């Protein structure tokens, strides 16, 4: 009989793939959601999607209240012509807690050229989200968006999949989308070709 942890891991993987592929095209092969000018596709329920430069389209500008200071807005437009990594997270999410150090490493890299990671906190109370940021020494800004309304602005990224990480090129077009936990090396590998473009 398989070990209970293996069964749980298999079940969680199946649920993640099911959530990532929650709507399908007529052939049943692609998860598709549409919003703004960028159209999100997850071919066959893939959890890492790369967009060639010729196929990239901009997302709508996003802005929202800061988790740490609700009187201040975090704005994508403040990083014009800079690479930005968007990350939907929640302090309740195990993979989100695991990847926070990786995101901080990427933030340190991007900050050298004026880029940033922008977190989008979902499904938390503001005090829990703020405590998580302070307790983990997170230096990048986060938007407080508990119902994840920004998902529509992000081209229909599935609001049910957390963490979700989107690497935007300098024109703020999605270059790579991760519908799962990431590592710093994966993000740096995705960012490197965008830095010279």
Question: Where are these predicted regions, by residue range?
Answer:
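Extracytoplasmic
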Residues: 57-59, 79-81, 112-115, 127, ...
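Hydrophobic beta-strand anchors of alpha/beta hydrolase catalytic cores
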Residues: 85-86, 117
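Thiol/disulfide oxidoreductase modules built on the thioredoxin-like
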Residues: 131-139, 145-197
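N-terminal targeting signals for export/organelle localization
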Residues: 1-65, 197
